[in-house]
Amino acid sequence: MEKEISKVSRIKGELRVPSDKSISHRSIILTSLADGVSVVKNFLKAGDTLTTLNVYRKLGVSIIEEKGVLKIKGVNLKGFKEPEDILDMGNSGTTTRLTLGLLSGQEFFSALTGDDSLRQRPMGRVADPLRSMGAKIDGRQDGKLLPLSVRGSSLKGIQFYNKRSSAQVKSALLIAGLLAEGKTKVTEPYISRDHTEKMLDAMGADIHIERDDEYSVTISGSKKLEGIEIDVPADPSSAAFFAAAAVLIPDSELLLKDVLINPTRDGFFRKLKEMGGDIRYTNIREKAKEPVADIYVRYSPDLKGIRIKKEDVPSMVDEIPLLSIVATQAEGETIITGAEELRVKESDRIKAVVENLKNLGIDVEELPDGMVIKGKQKVKGGVVDSYKDHRIAMGFSILGLISEEGIKIKDADSVFISYPEFYEHLERIISN
C-alpha cells in the first residue's frame, strides 16, 4: 500500500494512542508462566502482539477474550505443551527472543521461524548465553539466525554481562533463569527497559536489583509465580509520532492521554524537550506498577540541534529515526552516535533514514553508529521507501505533514505491526 501525506495547517485535539507493545508482549509471555489466572486490560491488538498471543496458544496456554479483556490461565513454569508445528514468529523479535528463553527450559522439542526480515535479525546474542546455561539451540549460521530448533534441557543459572543493554536479551535470560537451577544475574552498562523485572516482581518472583555504576538484576529459579491484573498504558513509542507533529506544525497543540513515562522508555520526550520542545507531563499517576501521564505538546518554533550519545540510546532506541526527522527542523547540527543497534532492527534504520532524507534533499551524513543531521531545512517532498518498517513509515508520514509538495510512503501498511489505526488517528487530529 502507498500512502500520500500532504502538508497541513495545524493539528489539535486529544488522543489515546494504542497500548504499549512491550508490556502487551510481556503480559502474555510472563503470565503464561504463572500458577493461576491473570487479567489483562487494554491489550494491544497489532501484528506483533497478536503473534505472541497465537504462539502461546499453540504452546497450550488458555487465552480467552471477554468484552475486550484477556484472561490468561497460566500453566506454571514447565506446563507448556510441545507445539505440533513450527512456531511462526512473524516479524516479532520480542516474541522470538523471549520465547527462546522460555523454550530452552521446557521438556520438549520446538522449532521457530519468522518472515523475511526476522530471519535476517541476529539471534546469537540470545542463543549464545542461553547455551551457556545448558540450552540446546541450533539453526542457520551456527544457530545465529532463524529458523532455530530448541530441544528443552536442564538449565543452570549464570552471570552475564549484557554489553548492548538489550531488554530482549535481559528478558530472555531472566525467563530462562526462572526455569534454571540456582541464580541468574544480568548486568548492563545502562539500564534497558525494565518491564520484565517490574512484572515478575509483581508476580512474586525472587528478584533483586542493584543500581551502582551499572545496573544488575538477579533472579532465582523454580519459584511459583502468581497471576496478576495488568492494565496496559498507552505506548510512548506510538505517542512520540504525534508529539513530533505537534512540535513541528504551527498553531498545533495536542494532549496525549494515559502515556507510559517509565524513565527507561521516555527518552524521546526528554530529548525533544532539550531541543526546545514545549512538552509537559500532567496528571502523573501509577498504573500496573508503571508511571503514566497525560502529555501536553504544542508547536515549538525554536528547536535546536542536540547530541545523542550511547547512554541515551536504550531509553529511545525505537524513536531515534523519528528524532532524526525532527532534527531536520532544528537549528544547527544534531549528532547521533552509539546507535549501531538500529542497523539490526526491522530494517537497517540508520541506512533507511539517511537514504530517505537524502532523497528528499536533506543534508545528512551517515556514521557507522548513527548520523549527523544539518538543520534547519525545507522539505520539498518526494517518495519514501519504508523498507516495510513500521517506524520508518510513520516517521516519514510526520515529515510529510510539513512538506511543500507531499511525501508518498511505500509499503505504508507496515504500520499494522505496532499501530494499525495510525492513519485513522492522524486524520482525526488533522480534521480537528
Swiss-Prot record:
Binding residue positions for 3-phosphoshikimate: 21-22, 26, 166, 168, 318, 345
Localization annotation: Cytoplasm
GO biological process, one term: chorismate biosynthetic process
Pathway stated in the Swiss-Prot or TrEMBL entry: Metabolic intermediate biosynthesis; chorismate biosynthesis; chorismate from D-erythrose 4-phosphate and phosphoenolpyruvate: step 6/7
Principal cellular location given in the protein's record: cytoplasm
Gene Ontology CC annotations of this record: cytoplasm
Catalytic activity: 3-phosphoshikimate + phosphoenolpyruvate = 5-O-(1-carboxyvinyl)-3-phosphoshikimate + phosphate
UniProt enzyme class: transferase
Binding site for phosphoenolpyruvate: 21, 93, 121, 168, 349, 391
A GO molecular function held by the record: 3-phosphoshikimate 1-carboxyvinyltransferase activity
EC number(s) from the headed UniProt entry: 2.5.1.19
Residue positions of the active site: 318 (proton acceptor)
SUPFAM superfamilies listed in its UniProt record: EPT/RTPC-like
Function of the protein: Catalyzes the transfer of the enolpyruvyl moiety of phosphoenolpyruvate (PEP) to the 5-hydroxyl of shikimate-3-phosphate (S3P) to produce enolpyruvyl shikimate-3-phosphate and inorganic phosphate.
Family (UniProt): Belongs to the EPSP synthase family.
Subunit structure: Monomer.
PANTHER family: AROM/DEHYDROQUINATE SYNTHASE, PENTAFUNCTIONAL AROM POLYPEPTIDE
Name this polypeptide is given: 3-phosphoshikimate 1-carboxyvinyltransferase
Name of the coding gene: aroA
